Amino acid sequence: MKRRTAREKALQALFQIDVSDIAVNEAIEHALDEEKTDPFFEQLVHGVLEHQDQLDEMISKHLVNWKLDRIANVDRAILRLAAYEMAYAEDIPVNVSMNEAIELAKRFGDDKATKFVNGVLSNIKSDIEQS
């Protein structure tokens, strides 16, 4: 499975978990849709869920006039996924994670999602580079 596909499927699983309280294994199964699982996909889903509180804190810090629970579910899932990669997946360059998140926002978000995701992730990138 290509990494872009793994990210899309991880986004689908995380979105389902967020909006429907579906069990993690069930969301993973549904996102894979009978396709063979992939270690990168598994790392993304489980990593985001394991670090969700820290990721939400990182994201919330950069939401201007917004609260995390008020942004679109898909945008929240994209931000969590990208923030996880940026903060915890050391083998992936931060710019790659940002670009992939922007592509996900273009594909799955509304017209304003791309700029919003880019803005939040740019601020998270600055925080990571300063630490």
From Swiss-Prot:
Record-stated family: Belongs to the NusB family.
Gene3D superfamilies: NusB-like
Annotated GO MF terms: RNA binding
A Pfam family recorded for this sequence: NusB
Cross-referenced InterPro entries: NusB-like_sf, NusB_fam, NusB_RsmB_TIM44
Domain of life the protein comes from: Bacteria
Record's keyword terms, sorted: RNA-binding, Transcription, Transcription antitermination, Transcription regulation
HAMAP family assigned to the protein according to its UniProt record, in alphabetical order: NusB
Transcription is among the record's keywords: yes
Function, in words: Involved in transcription antitermination. Required for transcription of ribosomal RNA (rRNA) genes. Binds specifically to the boxA antiterminator sequence of the ribosomal RNA (rrn) operons.
NCBIfam families per the UniProt record, alphabetical: nusB
Protein name: Transcription antitermination protein NusB
GO cellular component terms listed in the entry, alphabetical order: cytosol
SUPFAM superfamilies, sorted: NusB-like (SSF48013)
Signal peptide: none
One annotated GO biological process: transcription antitermination
Top-level taxonomy: Bacteria, Bacillati, Bacillota, Bacilli, Bacillales
Organism whose genome encodes this protein: Bacillus subtilis (strain 168)
